[in-house]
Amino acid sequence: PLTFEDVMNVIDLEQPEGVIVALGGQTAIGLASLLSQAGVRIFGSSSGSIELAEDRQLFEKAMEEIQIPMPKGKGVFDVASALAVAKEITYPVLVRPSFVLGGRMMHLVYDEESLKQKVEEALHLDSRYPVLIDKYILGQECEVDAICDGSDVFIPGIMEHIERTGVHSGDSMSVYPPYSLKDEVIATIVEQTRKIGLKLQMIGLYNIQFIIDANKQVYVIEVNPRSSRTVPFLAKATGLPIANLATKVMLGYSLKQLGYVGLYPNRKRWYVKSPTFSFSKISGMDVVLSPEMKSTGEAIGYDYSLNRALYKSLRASGVRVSNYGTVLATIADADKQAALPLIKRFYDLGFNIEATKGTALFLKENGIKTRIKKKISEGSDEILESIKKGYVTYVINTASERDSLMDGKIIRRAAIDNNVAVFTCLDTVLVLLNVLEEMTMRISLIDEE
């Protein structure tokens, strides 16, 4: 691991004029304060600016001063305070420790019992820092990578996530340029990005994640005062040398000198980033998407057609895309109405539909011919046998009730072990269907402009 002592040993040996921490991820910027105290010059955002972005109370105060909305929430140091905050802002809430990477131990909870358990786990991880309790807002998520020189801001691009809030940004499919955001929402995001960069006195790269709710209200989830994992994707999509530009800014160049200010114009092609997972190599790991990041890589697909770009990205990430076969559906009660039109589209495409009893009866009531499969918890292994023998093309599983969690986990694991595509988020299923309905098209070559 990157430690202060190791870095200081290199600095003592090399005697550099200064160091850049913003390109080294969360661990690197975590060393900024110690390095500054040791007299090391930090190129880019100062340790004070980094702290302003990272410290919950300081950041909330800064956002309030520039009138930028955030989801309601608070940091707590005990379970009783967590329960009080959750009662005030109402469930569901997001629970996460401070200063963690990849959404580690971040959970979406719906009741007091789950909240107690998750807060205790987070406090056990590190009781020196508060556990953050935030109101969960269901909405469209997007993120921005930007460069600030202290006076101006340059935004290479805005990326819109396929999956709605509740899935970690690193596990979401991401599209550039945005495919559904209205002009007024984009204008708000650009203005908020500018105001945040100047308020926090960012020098170089920073990343902001936003939520857009059903009323088109834009909220800031968090600001990362560093280069994000999305920079390589955005650099590829825009053709801009983003890291190079940011480094020049950190070394003292102004954005106006470099000729880049404001929002960079969108390119004509669509670029889609899909996460890649290593579930088949990590035995026992659950594949369900959640606020905690599980992906280990990413793939890109691009084309002048959005659906073709989505197809290429899915295929590049290892998803077997087939326009015939059998869909196995086990859907939570809360998701049944949203899943119905999606399952209907599979049925209309000619897929066989199989489901556990509750889901099957619901689908039959709505005119979809469905074969009932017994649950594993009922002592049957017919679902597992069907998956193992290659009869199932796709598994759609959104089960979240406690009594069906174990069934769902076993089904998801069996699918992964037998190279069957698993979808735990209906937003991703919608993308797959859009692709399947265009499967007869000729896929264009990945060419250069």
PLM features per residue range, with description:
Residues 1-4, 9-36, 331, 376-377, ...:
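N-terminal glycine-rich "phosphate-gripper" loop used for MgATP/nucleotide binding
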Residues 1-18, 26-29, 41-44, 66, ...:
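ATP-dependent carboxylate activation and anion-phosphoryl transfer catalytic cores
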Residues 1-3, 74-78, 108-111, 301, ...:
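Short acidic-hydrophobic, aromatic-tinged amphipathic segments that line or gate anion-handling sites
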Residues 17-54, 69-74, 346, 417-429:
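A short, GP-enriched loop/loop-strand-helix hinge that lies immediately N-terminal to
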Residues 21-23, 42-45, 72-75, 95, ...:
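General beta-strand structural signal in soluble alpha/beta enzymes
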Residues 36, 45-106, 366-375, 427-441:
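A conserved helix-loop-beta module that forms one wall/lid of the active-site cleft
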Residues 78, 289, 293-308, 312-315, ...:
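C-terminal accessory/binding modules appended to enzymatic or scaffolding proteins
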Residues 337-435:
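Feature captures the catalytic cores and cofactor-binding loops of soluble hydro-lyases/lyases
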